[in-house]
Amino acid sequence: MWDGQSEMCQAHVLFDSFVQAATCKETLRAFQDLCEELNLNPGGQPQFYHTLRSRLHYWKAKALWAKLDKRACQKEYMRGHACTSTTCLIIGAGPCGLRTAIELGFLGARVVLVEKRDAFSRNNVLHLWPFTIQDLRGLGAKKFYGKFCAGAIDHISIRQLQLMLLKVALLLGVEVHVNVEFKHLLEPPENQEKRVGWRAEVQPSSHPVRQLEFDVVIGADGRRNTLPGFRRKEFRGKLAIAITANFINRNTTAEAKVEEISGVAFIFNQRFFQDLRQATGIDLENIVYYKDDTHYFVMTAKKQSLLEKGVILRDYADTEMLLSRHNVDQNALLSYAREAADFSTNHQLPALDFAINHYGQSDVAMFDFTCMYASENAAMVRQRMGHPLLVALVGDSLLEPFWPMGTGIARGFLAAMDTAWMVRSWGQGNTPLEVLAERESVYRLLPQTTPENVSKNYSQFSVDPASRYPNINMQLINAAQVRHLIDTGEGPVLGLDAVSSPHPRLTRQESMARYSKLLSWCQEHTHGYRKVCVTDFTSSWRSGLALCALIHTFRPDLIDFASLEESEAEFSGQLGLDVAEQEFGICPIMTGKEMSVLEESDSLCMVMYLSQLHELLKDTSPPSGSQSSEERAVLFSSSRSPISLLSKLGQSLSRKRNPKDKKEKEADSVGKRRRTSQAGQSEEEDALHDGNENKSPAETPGSEPKASEGHSKVRSMASLLLAKFEENSPSPSTTAIRRQNYIHMYTGGVSSLALQIANQIQSQQAQAPKLLHRRESGSQKDLPVNVGSSDVCYFCGRRVYVMERLSAEGKFFHRSCFQCDHCSSTIRLSNYTYDQLHGKFYCKHHFSFRLASVAQRKRPAPPVAPRPAQASLAASSASTSLSSLGSVGTATPDSWSSSTHTDMASSLAKRLCGTPERIELENYKPSPQKQDSPLQEVPEETLAQHNLSASLQEKNAEEQSSSSESDLEEEELVWKKGEELHARTNGERKLDLEEELKEEEGGEKLEKQEGEEEGEVSEEEQDEGDSSDESYEGCSDDPDIDVSSLSESKLCDQREQEESVPFHQSPASTESPVSMKPSESDLTPDPSTTPESSPAKRSEVVEEFWMKSAEIRKSLGLTPLSRELQPKHIAASTQTSNVKESFYTSVTYNTAALDSPNQSARICDSSTQTHSVTDLQETSPLGPTDGDAGVDLGRCSVVHRLSITVEGCVMADNQGLDSTSFATESVLNPDAGLPTPPYSPSHSPLVGKQCRALHHSEPILDREVMAFSSTCTASVPQRSSFKSDLEQAQSLPPDEIEILCGDEAEKLPERSCRMESGEVDNRRAEHSRTLPDRVVAPLLAGGPEVRLRRSEMKLWGPDADGDVKEKKRSSLFSPRKSRKNGNAAAESGRETGKHKSLWKTVFSVYKKDKKRKEVAVVAETLPAANNGSKRKVSGINRTTDLCFRKNPSFSEDTDMSCHALLERCPLRAQRAGTEEELNARLTRRVQRAARRQAKQEELRRLHRAQIIQRQLEQVEVKQRQLEEKGVAVEKALRGEADFWEDSSTSVLLDVHLCGMGKKDDPSLMHQWFKLVQEKNALVRYESELMIFARELELEDRQSRLQQELRERMAVDDHLKGEEELAEERRILSEMLDVVEQRDALVALLEEQRVREKEEDSDLEAVMLSKGFSLHWD
C-alpha cells in the first residue's frame, strides 16, 4: 500500500515538473519520465490521452483533464474516432504546426511532428485576437502559464506559446521528434508487393521516422518551398524594413510602470515620429512595444534614416543586397534600436540590456517586408502507384502575415482548424475532388478574416468552419475547378516556385473594341453641336469645342456653349479642362494652349484623358430639357464616382493659403470662427482661417468677454451637438486617447497590433531604378522641340510622359516627384496643401512648417548623451555610428544597372524559399569582423538563464499552483492557498507588480467564463483579480479620467507601493527613477483649505460647486474635478505620465496624523504603518497591544490600513431603505475641502497578500454574507457584548470593512475621541440624515470584527425627466445606437438626493469598480481560523462568482437597459436583493461594457487604417509598374527608340518589338489602351481607399474632440478663465464642423454604395482578380 502511494506521489512530482518545464528539451524529458513512471508508450498508441488520464489521478491533473475533456467531447471529433486510420506528418513545431497537431490528435489520427531544432528560442511577442485567447484557455493554457493573457493583455511570446502547445500536444499522444530535418517526400516504389506508400526523407537518415508511411503531409515550417507544387501570389508594397529588438525584463517596479505602446495610426497623428526624428535623427514609420518575458520592440524604419545613422553602409536597389550582413553595421543597428526604444518609452526603462538570440548574439534583427506571398491553394493531392497523399500548408507557408496587422497567429489557428476539418473529410472517405473543393472554398475566406467578421460565439468554435465563419458557402468552389490540384504524375506538374501574375490580360480584340467604343461614345454625345465633328483623338479636339460639348451634354449648367467661339480655341480648351477638374475630379493632362495645337502623336494624351471621362459618365443619361439646373446637379451627384467625390473633398480643403506669421496663427487659433465645408484638415491647418484672417479674437462671433454670455453660448451649442449626435451619427464613439508626452498611444487591449505602415516612404525608393536611370539620361536639354509645359516636370525639370503625369494647381509632374517640401514624403492629389506665394506643396501635417526657421533635417542629429548606467556601451555605439558615416554612400545609377542577372536570380530564389524572418535568422552573423567564423547555437537553457533569469523563479513558484481549479480537491486547494499565503506573509514571495499593473478589466469576461466552467477560481486567477487593483490602472481604459487631476493620488500611491514591497526583496526590485518620488511640498495641503480655516465657508463653496454644474453634469454624464489638483501637480504628472494612475487617493484617515497641520505630511507615509501592521500581527495577533504613543499610532494605522472598500450589497433594511453598491461614496477630506474617495487598497505585505485569496470574486450578496456569519455562531459571543461597539462605529467613514484585531475593537470609542469633534459631527450628520449605518455582526470570536458600512449613495434620483437625462448622458459620448425604452420599471425606482446621485456619477464614470476587494478576506486574515472556515469562504467565493458569471452578455450588450439586463439576470441573483440593488450593479456593468466596446471600436479603427494603408502601398507599386510599361509604349509610338536599348534588362510585358518603328502600329495602340484601362481602374480604387481614409480621420478627430470637451466640461464654468471658456467654444465649434463633414461624407458614400450595387460590373470582383481586397472592416 505504501509503495503504491509512493509511486503515485512520484508521478505527481513528475507531472508538476512537466507542467513547469520552461524549455523544449526539459518538457520532452519530463514527459518521457512521466510516461515511464506510468508504464505508457506514447509512440503510436491509440487513444493515448484516455489511457494517460485513467492512470494519473492527481488533483492538479484533473483540472487539466476537465479542460481537455470539454474540448474532446465536441461532436466533430466523434470521440476520437474520426481519423483513427490516418497517419499525418507535420513539418515544423511552430505555433501553427503544433495547433494543427492538437486538432488532429483530438480527431484520433496518428500524428508525427518533426522539428529541425530542439529549442524554442524566439523571444518575439505575438498579438492575439479574442478568439485565440479563448481557444488557448480552452486547451488549459493557464494551467501551464498562470499569467496567460491576464485581464486585457492580448499578447504572448512565441517561446511561451510554443511551450504551452507542445505540452498539450504531448498529452494528446502526438509524437514529437526534435533534431530531425525534413528533406523531401519519397514516392511509393514501383514494386508494390509490400504495398509501400508515401514516406519522408529525413536527416539523420537512420531515424525511425523515415520508415513510417503517411496519408497526410502538412507543411508548417514557414518556408515557401518545403512542399513543391504550390503557386504563390505576390503582394508587393513599398520598401518596408522592420527591426525587432528584445531587451531583458527584470520585472522591477520601474519597469512595471512603463506603458506599453500598442500602435499609433498614421492617419491620425505624426507628432511623435517628428519629435523622434528631431531629437535623435531616427525616422520611423511605426513602433510597437509589448512587455512580456522580454521588453519587445518592433518598428519600421525608413531607409534614408538607416543610411544617415550608419546602420546600412551602402544604398542598393535590391533589398536583398541592401540588408545583407555585409552591408549592415551591427553595432550601429544595436544603437539605433536602443535609442528608438529609449525615446519611445520616455526614457523610463532603467536598463536596456539586450536579450540574446539562439546564436548568443544581441537579439536585434532587420527584415524586409516589402513583398508578402500567399499560396494560391491550400492543399493538393498526389497519387502514385495507387497511393494518394494529401498535401497541405498552414502558417506562414500558406499565408504570410503583415506583422503590424497582428493577424499571424489568429489566421494561422483558423487555417489549422480548417486543415483538420479537411483531414477529417479525408479520413471519412470523401473523394479527393470533394475534399479539395471544400478546402479551397474555405480558404477563400482566410485572407479576409478580421476580429470583427468571425463568429462571436467563441466557446462554440470547432474544426467545422461553419462554427467560425458566418454565412460560409462550403460549395463556393466546385470539383471541376480543383481538378488541376490532383497530381497523378502523368500531366505537367506546376512549377516549383511559380509566382502567378495577379492581373488578367485584355485580348487584342477586346482592346480594339473598347478603343472603338470610346470614339463612338464621344461622337454620340457631341452630335448636333455646331462646329463639332469628332473623327479621331487629335485634330477633332483642337478647338476645344468638342470637350466643352461633351461636358455640356451631361451638365449644361456648367458651360454656356453658345458663347464659345471656334477662334478662341485656347480659351475653350482651358475652360473644358478646368470644369472637368473642378466638377469631375479629372486632372488635366495638358494645357488649353497645348490642346489647340494637338498633333498626331498626342492622341495618347487624349485617349488617356477621355477614357477617364468615359468611365465617369458612361452610366449617366444626359438630362432632359425640362429639368432645372438644380435637378441636373442632383441627378449627377447621385452618380458621382469615387474620383469626383474625392475631388470634391479635396476642393473643400482650402489649399491655396497665403502664409502668415506664426504669432498671427497662434492668435487666430483662439477665436477661430466655424467652418462648415472643410473636409480633412489636420490640427496645424485648423489653426488657419479661410478668410477674415486679420480679425482679432475679440471680434470673433461667440467670443464675448462676459462669462455669463459665454456660458449660455456653450450650453446652447452643447445642446445642438447633443441633438445632432442622437439624430445623425451612425457610428459609435470611442474611448479617449490617453496622451503621453509625445504621442497618442493606444494602450491596453490591443487589437492587434494596430500600427501605421509605410507612411510616406523615402523618395529614393518611390522612383524605380530604371526610371531614375532613364531620367538621368533624358535631361532637359535633350527634350524634343515640340515639348510643351505639360511635358516638363515642375519639380525635377525632366520629361514627364503621359502615363506617369499628374497635375495640381496648374503644375505637371511625375507621380514620384510630388513630395512634401518639408519632409520629402510622397503626397497624393487629394491630400496636399499649396503655398501659392512660394509655389511649394506640403503634406497636410507640415503646412504650418513652411516658414519655420529650423531647416529641414538632412543629416543625422548628434548622438544623445548616454545614461550613466550604460555609459561605456552607449559611447562605443555612438562612436561607431559616427565613424561609419564616412562610409555611407548612395549607389549611382551605373552601379544599379551593372548588377548581374545572377545576383538578381539568387536573390529572387532566396526570397521564394523563405519568409523574411527565416532568411534573417538563417543568415545571421555576429559581426562583419567574424563573418568567416562558424556560428554555434546556444543551448536553450543558457538562453533562458540570460533572458529570463529575473522572472523564472517567480514564474515557477506561481505555476506550481497553476492548475488548482478542481472542485473535486477543494480541501487540498484551500490547504495549498493557506500555505502559500503564509509564505507570502513571511516575505518569501514579492508582489508581482508587473502583473498588477498590466491586468485590466478587459479580460473579466473570459475569467468569468472559465470560472463558471470549473466551479472554482484558481489561485492564479485570484492573484490576477488582485492585480487589477485600481491603484495602478484606474484610468488605463476608463475614457473619462483627466490625467492631470490624478497626480496627487498617483504620488501617494507610488510611495505606498514602493515602500510596501516586502523587506526581503532584492535591491533590483526597488529601482525607481528619482522623479517618481514626490516632494514634501507636493504632499502638504494648502493652508487655506485646512480644517481650521472656516469649515462653514468651505461647505458653502462645495454646495455651490455642485448646484452650479448640476445641469451639464447630468446631461453629459460629467462631474467636476478639483481645480486645485490640476495646476498644482502638473509637473509631477508630466514626469510620471506613463504610470498607471488611480482615481483613489492613498490618503488614510489617520486621526492622529490629522490632529495638526504640521503632521499632514505623514498622510502618505506608509512605512510606519507597514511596520505597525507587521509588528502587531506577528507579536500579538489576538490580544491588545498597549504601549506608548508610537504604538498607539500604529494601532490606529492598523485600523485604517485594513480598511477595504467593498462593492457587495448588504441586506436591505426592512424599513424600505434602498440598497445600492459600496465603493461609490467618499468622505470629505478635511485637508482639501473637496470630495476625495476613501482609501481603499491594502498595500502592506501582510494584508496585500492575504487579500488575494478571494479578491477575484464578485460582490457578495447580502444573504450570503449573513449565511456566512451564521455558520460561525457557535464561536461568536453574545451579540449584546458588541452592542456598544457597534453603536460607536457610526463615527467611521461609510463603505468600509474594518478588521480590528482582538481587544482593539474595544478601543474604538477611544480612537473616535481623537478626531476633531467638529469633523466627526459633520461627517456623522452628513451620512446619518439619509440612512443609518448598517453593521453586520462580527464573524469570528477572538479574531477580527468585520464592520460593514452601508453605502448611502443613490444611483438614481427621482427626476420625472430622468429617462431623458439618462439618454442624453449616454448618447453624447457613448456608442450612438438607438436606446431601448423598456426600462420604465427601473426608472421608477429612482430616489431623491441630488448630491448623492452626482457622487454616484463621479465614481461610476471616473473609476472602474473594485470588484475583487471582498469581505471574505477575513477568514484568510485570522491566524487561528480553522480549515473549515477557509473552506466555507472558498465556497462563498465560488457561489458568488457563479451567480454573476452565468450571464456573459453583460459585457456584450452595451446598449441594453438596466431593466432588460435585470430580466436576464439569474434567478438566484434576483432573489438575493432588491430590484434597485441589482439595477445598481447592472448599471455599472453596462458602463464597463460600454467603455470596453468603445476601446474595441478604437482598435478596430486602427486595424482598418492599417489595411487601407497597406492597400494604398500596393496600388502605388502597381501604378509605378504601369507607368514603366506606359512610358515604354509611348516612346515606341513616338518613335523615340533610344529607350529600347535597355529593354534587355527590364521586365516590360506585352510590348511587341516588331512594331517599334511604326507610330501607328495597332499592336502598340492595343497595348496602350490596355494600360490606360488598368490605370483607370487603379485610380478609381485608390480614390475609394482615400475616401475611407478620410472618413477614418474625421471619425478619430471627432473622438479626440469629444474627449477634450468631456475633460473641460467636467470643471464648473465659474472656475474657468476667459481663455478656457473661449477654448471650450472653439472645441464645440470644431466638433460641429467635423460632425457636419462626416455626415456629408457618409451620405455621399451611401449614395455611391447604392449606385455601385446596381452597376453591372462589380469593381470588387475586378480588383480581387488583380490581387487586391476591398475588405477593410
UniProtKB/Swiss-Prot annotation:
Gene3D superfamilies attached to this UniProt entry: Calponin-like domain (1.10.418.10), Cysteine Rich Protein (2.10.110.10), FAD/NAD(P)-binding domain (3.50.50.60)
Enzyme nomenclature, EC number: 1.14.13.225
Keyword Ligase: no
PROSITE patterns with a match to the protein in the record: BMERB (PS51848), CH (PS50021), LIM_DOMAIN_1 (PS00478), LIM_DOMAIN_2 (PS50023)
Binding residue positions for FAD: 96-124, 396
GO biological process terms held by the UniProt record: actin filament depolymerization; cytoskeleton organization; exocytosis
Coiled-coil features, chain-numbered ranges: 1475-1531, 1573-1638
Alphabetically ordered keywords of this record: Actin-binding, Coiled coil, Cytoplasm, Cytoskeleton, Exocytosis, FAD, Flavoprotein, LIM domain, Metal-binding, Monooxygenase, NADP, Nucleus, Oxidoreductase, Zinc
Positions of the UniProt region annotated as Monooxygenase domain: 2-492
Compartmental location: Cytoplasm; Cytoplasm, Cytoskeleton; Nucleus
Broad enzyme group: oxidoreductase
Catalysis: reaction(s): L-methionyl-[F-actin] + NADPH + O2 + H(+) = L-methionyl-(R)-S-oxide-[F-actin] + NADP(+) + H2O
Bias-annotated ranges (Polar residues): 1159-1182
Comp. bias regions, Low complexity: 882-892, 1081-1094
TM ranges: none
Molecular function terms, GO-annotated: actin binding; F-actin monooxygenase activity; FAD binding; metal ion binding; oxidoreductase activity, acting on paired donors, with incorporation or reduction of molecular oxygen, NAD(P)H as one donor, and incorporation of one atom of oxygen
Family listed: Belongs to the Mical family.
Function according to Swiss-Prot or TrEMBL: Monooxygenase that promotes depolymerization of F-actin by mediating oxidation of specific methionine residues on actin. Acts by modifying actin subunits through the addition of oxygen to form methionine-sulfoxide, leading to promote actin filament severing and prevent repolymerization. Involved in exocytic vesicles tethering and fusion: the monooxygenase activity is required for this process.
Name of the protein in its database record: Protein-methionine sulfoxide oxidase mical3b
Organism: Danio rerio
